[in-house]
Amino acid sequence: MVFFDLGDTLWHFPAMPPVEVVRGETMKRVSALVRSWGYEVDGERAYLARDIRFAIEEETSRAFHGDCIDPGYPDICRRVAARHGLDLTPEQGMALWEAWNLGGAFLGRRLYPDVLDTLRWLRGRGYRLGAITNRGYSGPRFHEEMRDLGLAELFEVTVISCDVGYMKPHPRIFQYALEAMDVEAAESVMVGDSLRADVEGAKTVGMLAVWRRPSAADPVEATEDQPEQAGPVQPDYVIGTIGELRSLPLFIASGPAG
């Protein structure tokens, strides 16, 4: 069984719009939603999208470097909205969170060139595939994008932190994935770009770990992990691209372990 991280492992954002365009679009969508609920959007309330971003960045960092419990992003949106005088229901909090997420299509998400061929090669050798990802949004638009990218048909399971309540490297998210696929950790491999989230997390539960080493062209999600590269947990294998999996003895010497 081979599990993959998603961001900066299988896909990246080479065509991301300028930051001012992204933030402007977020503000537009959030403001339109708030107006649809009958609220005025003026004064400080016009900066609701910005304040949600600040809170998300703070809470995500706290969780990732702390207890790895998912922060509950719709609730974060409700709390920030309350500071702007908006009394939102849980359903409205979820709608606000969905509006704040622009989606991979808008942000220019693309698979790395060798991803689909490599995943199909692994499937052809009898390996079962899945994904384990730290992600605050798992709504219908995300799963539609997974289908559009060609990943949904290749993965038997996609385990998302906001759905299970735990972020990598917490053992529970890995255990959830193993239980969902009815496989043992010793039979499984984790491939990802984060030494802490993917390598440390996988090895803690007894999985093999392949580190997809971030390149200079992929700085977005790698920056956070740079201090961890000298840590005590080391990957079993290191690759520069997903295509290099096809040359690892792990995958060419034999078929799946179980």
Regions found by a protein language model. Name each.
Residues 1-2, 12, 32-44, 116, ...:
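Asp-based, Mg2+/Mn2+-dependent phosphohydrolase catalytic module
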Residues 7, 13-63:
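Conserved phosphoryl-transfer catalytic core
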Residues 14-24, 65-69, 139, 219-222:
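Short, flexible/disordered intra-domain loops and linkers
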Residues 15-16, 61-63, 102-105, 127-128, ...:
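A short, structure-level motif marking secondary-structure boundaries and short turns
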Residues 25-40, 71-87, 150:
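Helix-loop "lid/cap" segments that line or gate small-molecule binding pockets
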Residues 50-56, 76-78, 96-103:
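Short, Lys/Arg-enriched alpha-helical recognition elements, typified by the DNA-recognition helix
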Residues 67-75, 90-92, 99-130:
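Short, acidic loop-to-helix structural element flanking the phosphoryl-transfer center
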